[in-house]
Amino acid sequence: MEPEFLYDLLQLPKGVEPPAEEELSKGGKKKYLPPTSRKDPKFEELQKVLMEWINATLLPEHIVVRSLEEDMFDGLILHHLFQRLAALKLEAEDIALTATSQKHKLTVVLEAVNRSLQLEEWQAKWSVESIFNKDLLSTLHLLVALAKRFQPDLSLPTNVQVEVITIESTKSGLKSEKLVEQLTEYSTDKDEPPKDVFDELFKLAPEKVNAVKEAIVNFVNQKLDRLGLSVQNLDTQFADGVILLLLIGQLEGFFLHLKEFYLTPNSPAEMLHNVTLALELLKDEGLLSCPVSPEDIVNKDAKSTLRVLYGLFCKHTQKAHRDRTPHGAPN
């Protein structure tokens, strides 16, 4: 290996292992995201905004994404997401267990996406292979393009760019190069924080908001059934904190002594005590993605109530999905 190639490889950041030469065909290239790029605040924010958008879109289908890198590769979530965004039905099997069937499903979905975006295959910054191989950059390029096409008012962080390491197999060995990859458009305006996903939800048509509420009410009633309780009105029935505390106890395995809360609160102060206790429990469990005022819950603010229940919904719907998913699928 010539000195310049050795020097290039020595520039790889700690934590990025150079591939063996046999992993790349001659002339082949592969991108790596160094740890410093992964930890870039704007890069992390972009992933967060996209995940919240996907989860809000797929909430009526009880589908929850926890990781864009790990959850998108097999085409299942992309299939459901694109069908809902484009309001069409794709001829692809719902469940694909083998690598071959997953790639076929992904091919069908990406061909439909590219047609919708009016892109030739060579123009797209993603491919079946890159998505299937869990290439985070390709996945982000794809999701950003879908968001711009189907929800242009989604407030993505602007000018997100990350440093990537490109490894190329040449006649003389492996050569590395540092490049900057642009993920979202540059804006000359002062960057604004992304809009809250629930603020965006409540700007949609009432039937879409109601569909989300209905999905969460169904989830809550499934969990409260063993207690002989049910919820009909999400906006009002959580205001005193009692059902919220009982729901948290059921889902998170907490035993709450009756001395710790008011089972039949008779005043706003007692209701506020219950709701404050519930929010503290959720915060301790990492289930509050952003601050919620207990007064808003007591005052029957639908958006705040929905935000609180959404954290529980995501965690336990995802857990149920993992429990049902077969492991060790054959290739």
UniProtKB/Swiss-Prot annotation:
The modification N-acetylmethionine is found at residue 1. Residues 44-151, 210-317 form the Calponin-homology (CH) domain. It is a peripheral membrane protein. The keyword Hydrolase does not apply. GO terms for molecular function: actin binding. Expressed predominantly in lymphoid organs, including spleen, thymus, lymph node, bone marrow and peripheral blood leukocytes and moderately in the digestive tract, including stomach, duodenum, jejunum, ileum, ileocecum and appendix, as well as in lung and liver. Also expressed in tumors, but at a lower level than in the corresponding normal tissues. Gene3D superfamilies: Calponin-like domain. Pfam families: CH (PF00307). SUPFAM superfamilies: Calponin-homology domain, CH-domain. It is found in: Cell junction, Focal adhesion; Cell membrane; Cytoplasm, Cytoskeleton. Residues 17-39 are annotated as: Disordered. One of its GO terms (cellular component) is plasma membrane. Keywords: Acetylation, Actin-binding, Cell adhesion, Cell junction, Cell membrane, Cytoplasm, Cytoskeleton, Membrane, Repeat. GO terms for biological process: actin cytoskeleton organization; cell projection assembly; cell-matrix adhesion; establishment or maintenance of cell polarity regulating cell shape; substrate adhesion-dependent cell spreading. Interacts with ILK; the interaction promotes the establishment of cell polarity required for leukocyte migration. Interacts with ARHGEF6; the guanine nucleotide exchange factor activity of ARHGEF6 is essential for the PARVG-induced enhancement of cell spreading. Plays a role with ILK in promoting the cell adhesion and spreading of leukocytes. This is Gamma-parvin. It comes from Homo sapiens (Human). The lineage of its organism: Eukaryota, Metazoa, Chordata, Craniata, Vertebrata.
